[in-house]
From Swiss-Prot:
Keyword Iron-sulfur among record annotations: no
Protein keywords: Cytoplasm, Nucleus, Ribosome biogenesis
Top-rank taxon, per record: Eukaryota
Location of this chain's protein in the cell: Cytoplasm; Nucleus
Protein's UniProt name: Ribosome maturation protein sdo1
Gene3D superfamilies in the record: 3.30.70.240, Ribosome maturation protein SBDS, N-terminal domain, SBDS protein C-terminal domain, subdomain 1
Amino acid sequence: MVISQPVGQIRLTNVSVVKYKKGGKRFEVACYKNKVTEWRNKIETDLDEVLQIHNVFNNVSKGHVASRQDLKKAFGTDDIDKIILEILQKGDFQVGEKERHHQMSSTYRDIVSHVTAMCMDPNSKRPYPASIIEKALSDCGFSVSTSKTAKSQALEAIKKLQEKNEIPIVRARMRIRIVVDVKQGKALRERLRSLADEIEEENIDDEYECIALVIPGNYKLIDELVRNETKNRGMVQVLDMSEART
């Protein structure tokens, strides 16, 4: 970023511009490439990772910063954060070919990750490797959208795989048993609950014991959490794996 004279002109390079018209004037914010769609899809939540500079422009390419008077007149406020959020939510932006390809690839990888985390082969009762999910999605003609979240598209992908019968696949849940020291159990309880679909049993006596239903993708997170926080003294045991209720 280069700041140049006169004051009020800021020149940016390698930028994705979000444009928004309000109150008869044009306003723009300068963002990093690939980040606007991620922010709208709630993949990226840190505005500092989205914005190249925390300011509002009349024209990014010319480096013209919007005046406080123009902002107040158009938006009814000169609160930069509120104005930036409105522009990001409602503004238009163009996506270049390289940026579009990056977005599509990133979203596709996220979709595959969600599908492998939520599903299993009903015959083996085990999750599919990502490579098999990728091939099945390709064979059934699944197409990626950059305007929808990866999770919502993963649910669509699962439905399409089931309809096309490319591979036997069902939504899955694992029943697991977690045993840790009472003190550690009280400390971990809320985090374990946030990762579980359902808590079937929970006992706190000489030790903390919990029977929970989780999606396959969260089993690894729970196992790592318990091992790290208990220094390998806790236990996570898989009791069974079954088709999830729909």
